[in-house]
Amino acid sequence: MEFKVLDKGFLRLVDILGDDYSAVKAARVSYGKGIKTPEKDKNLIFYLMEHKHETPFEHIVFTFHVKTPIFVARQWFRHRIGSFNEASLRYTELKDEFYLPDHIRKNIVEDKQKAVRVEELKLKEQALELIYNSIEDSYKVYRKLLELGVAREMARIVLPMSSYTQFYWTVNARSLMNFLNLRADSHAQWEIQQYAIKIAKIFKEKCPWTFESFLKFNYRGDILREVEL
């Protein structure tokens, strides 16, 4: 499964270990029992989620391949429970790929974590022009440094946070749900929200019972109930 995200990014499901039944079997091993009827197995998933017995969900593991701007990746890497491998700009040259937003946002005085889109056309045009010009100038300097023979590990220091990077992310379902609680929420930055929504789509398809129970009992965000998954 793969989804296009932002202007040049993507989210790709590389591998998955387990499903809803993995959590069921992990929960029932304590009693020496396994899978029963679908109805009873689904009810068990809902019981585990409602009563915060979450360790069985750690036996469902996803691996994603992500392409995203560096500023999004740095927010992503704050989620410590998971494994990351990122492309290195010390050993590879950066392609001419940058996140170019199509809108501008301003902070809300009442809530510093939220931002709203700017509708004033003149301000939007001025801000976007400054962003685009800054990115273009930075990349020109980067290429010039490489042409001069400067090492990639030094030339990269002029690159903007809008540069695209790629990484692998391996995460269990319990930690993935924590990610969705924090990033599939209007308080998170809009760009990472877009990735969180696509992750939720994959989660729903691959583990429908777990996702449904998560949305009912444990989801603390606000946008997954407002979008079509």
From Swiss-Prot:
Binds 4 FAD per tetramer. Each FAD binding site is formed by three monomers. The active site is at 183 (involved in ionization of n3 of dump, leading to its activation). One of its GO terms (molecular function) is flavin adenine dinucleotide binding. GO terms for biological process: dTMP biosynthetic process; dTTP biosynthetic process; methylation. A motif (ThyX motif) lies at residues 78-88. Residues 1-217 form the ThyX domain. DUMP binds at residues 75-78, 86-90, 156, 183. It catalyses: dUMP + (6R)-5,10-methylene-5,6,7,8-tetrahydrofolate + NADPH + H(+) = dTMP + (6S)-5,6,7,8-tetrahydrofolate + NADP(+). Belongs to the thymidylate synthase ThyX family. Homotetramer. This is Flavin-dependent thymidylate synthase. It comes from Thermosipho melanesiensis (strain DSM 12029 / CIP 104789 / BI429). The gene is thyX.
